[in-house]
Amino acid sequence: MSATRRIVLGLIPADGIGKEVVPAARRLMENLPAKHKLKFDFIDLDAGWGTFERTGKALPERTVERLKTECNAALFGAVQSPTHKVAGYSSPIVALRKKMGLYANVRPVKSLDGAKGKPVDLVIVRENTECLYVKEERMVQNTPGKRVAEAIRRISEEASTKIGKMAFEIAKSRQKIRESGTYSIHKKPLVTIIHKSNVMSVTDGLFRESCRHAQSLDPSYASINVDEQIVDSMVYRLFREPECFDVVVAPNLYGDILSDGAASLIGSLGLVPSANVGDNFVMSEPVHGSAPDIAGRGIANPVATFRSVALMLEFMGHQDAAADIYTAVDKVLTEGKVLTPDLGGKSGTNEITDAVLANIHN
């Protein structure tokens, strides 16, 4: 018999509905079937706007230190960041990605079997550490009425090659799953590189070139098709022909925009998971924001968080446990009896959690 695997998981609810969906996910993990032989130990950690207001730091050093020294993985809830400059504040999720070496943001978007509209089954792989998100901005000229600001957009060969390799690995993995017959949507493996090198020939040109080079790094990638899309054309095609895409790889900003847009293809940001992935650590994170308008009302949709837990478990090698979560969640959504208001229902976070757990144990 295989031994029970202990996972020490850092829980970072952060702000808004993060404080509701992360506890729901904890309950889910605590009640996974014994057959999976997983034991979770949880460490509660601070970050976010609320933490900044209390302590003056959005990401306490203690949080990073405990993640690095005590945790196998982490679950992040949601962050409420101001839209204007606040002295001393910097986004904790962006900082965590850099400090933990989480160079890839992986966001699967998949419609339910039998759902109306065109079938959607794609993954957006977003470079997580560079582009405009290096946050190197400055005011060049500060004369009232004539102010000029500029920002650095950094693209490196190393980071672009790494994210390209991740995209090819995911495409290869998805093809293996399709060949096993467990996917209802069949397509050839394809990596689509997103860029705007017709305008930004140096930065996006380097990203494009590096992603293409990544295919040559492993002979097993040779059977994977590759194409390219200019980012504005990609926006059009994503909404018109989502069934044409498999794995989409993009620089940070483009990937951020495309992945949120892709969520609309399946109905709600509350359904879409993501994982921030590094060489030795994964931090899952639902795509939705902190939703302050519904925070504290008990109606936050935990589905994206549950799927984020499943995605985290996939990257940690626990595919069977992940599959159980995906199946249980999909059944709740397909039946349509227990849905939160964002999906047209009247149920709350706890009711959704109860229904998912009931499916897992049946």
Swiss-Prot record:
<keyword id="KW-0028">Amino-acid biosynthesis</keyword>
<dbReference type="InterPro" id="IPR019818">
    <property type="entry name" value="IsoCit/isopropylmalate_DH_CS"/>
</dbReference>
<dbReference type="GO" id="GO:0009085">
    <property type="term" value="P:lysine biosynthetic process"/>
</dbReference>
<feature type="binding site">
    <location>
        <position position="256"/>
    </location>
    <ligand>
        <name>Mg(2+)</name>
    </ligand>
</feature>
<dbReference type="GO" id="GO:0047046">
    <property type="term" value="F:homoisocitrate dehydrogenase activity"/>
</dbReference>
<keyword id="KW-0597">Phosphoprotein</keyword>
<feature type="binding site" description="in other chain">
    <location>
        <position position="107"/>
    </location>
    <ligand>
        <name>(2R,3S)-homoisocitrate</name>
    </ligand>
</feature>
<feature type="binding site">
    <location>
        <position position="198"/>
    </location>
    <ligand>
        <name>NADH</name>
    </ligand>
</feature>
<protein>
    <recommendedName>
        <fullName>Homoisocitrate dehydrogenase</fullName>
        <ecNumber>1.1.1.87</ecNumber>
    </recommendedName>
</protein>
<keyword id="KW-0460">Magnesium</keyword>
<comment type="pathway">
    <text>Amino-acid biosynthesis; L-lysine biosynthesis via AAA pathway; L-alpha-aminoadipate from 2-oxoglutarate: step 4/5.</text>
</comment>
<dbReference type="GO" id="GO:0005759">
    <property type="term" value="C:mitochondrial matrix"/>
</dbReference>
<feature type="binding site" description="in other chain">
    <location>
        <position position="126"/>
    </location>
    <ligand>
        <name>(2R,3S)-homoisocitrate</name>
    </ligand>
</feature>
<keyword id="KW-0963">Cytoplasm</keyword>
<feature type="binding site" description="in other chain">
    <location>
        <position position="133"/>
    </location>
    <ligand>
        <name>(2R,3S)-homoisocitrate</name>
    </ligand>
</feature>
<feature type="binding site">
    <location>
        <position position="260"/>
    </location>
    <ligand>
        <name>Mg(2+)</name>
    </ligand>
</feature>
<dbReference type="GO" id="GO:0051287">
    <property type="term" value="F:NAD binding"/>
</dbReference>
<feature type="binding site">
    <location>
        <begin position="79"/>
        <end position="81"/>
    </location>
    <ligand>
        <name>NADH</name>
    </ligand>
</feature>
<feature type="binding site">
    <location>
        <position position="196"/>
    </location>
    <ligand>
        <name>(2R,3S)-homoisocitrate</name>
    </ligand>
</feature>
<feature type="binding site">
    <location>
        <position position="198"/>
    </location>
    <ligand>
        <name>(2R,3S)-homoisocitrate</name>
    </ligand>
</feature>
<dbReference type="InterPro" id="IPR024084">
    <property type="entry name" value="IsoPropMal-DH-like_dom"/>
</dbReference>
<dbReference type="GO" id="GO:0005739">
    <property type="term" value="C:mitochondrion"/>
</dbReference>
<feature type="binding site" description="in other chain">
    <location>
        <position position="97"/>
    </location>
    <ligand>
        <name>(2R,3S)-homoisocitrate</name>
    </ligand>
</feature>
<keyword id="KW-0560">Oxidoreductase</keyword>
<keyword id="KW-0520">NAD</keyword>
<feature type="binding site">
    <location>
        <position position="232"/>
    </location>
    <ligand>
        <name>Mg(2+)</name>
    </ligand>
</feature>
<keyword id="KW-0479">Metal-binding</keyword>
<feature type="binding site" description="in other chain">
    <location>
        <position position="81"/>
    </location>
    <ligand>
        <name>(2R,3S)-homoisocitrate</name>
    </ligand>
</feature>
<dbReference type="GO" id="GO:0000287">
    <property type="term" value="F:magnesium ion binding"/>
</dbReference>
<keyword id="KW-0457">Lysine biosynthesis</keyword>
<feature type="binding site">
    <location>
        <position position="301"/>
    </location>
    <ligand>
        <name>NADH</name>
    </ligand>
</feature>
<comment type="similarity">
    <text>Belongs to the isocitrate and isopropylmalate dehydrogenases family.</text>
</comment>
<dbReference type="GO" id="GO:0005737">
    <property type="term" value="C:cytoplasm"/>
</dbReference>
<dbReference type="GO" id="GO:0019878">
    <property type="term" value="P:lysine biosynthetic process via aminoadipic acid"/>
</dbReference>
<feature type="modified residue" description="Phosphoserine">
    <location>
        <position position="91"/>
    </location>
</feature>
<feature type="modified residue" description="Phosphoserine">
    <location>
        <position position="81"/>
    </location>
</feature>
<dbReference type="Pfam" id="PF00180">
    <property type="entry name" value="Iso_dh"/>
</dbReference>
<feature type="binding site">
    <location>
        <begin position="289"/>
        <end position="293"/>
    </location>
    <ligand>
        <name>NADH</name>
    </ligand>
</feature>
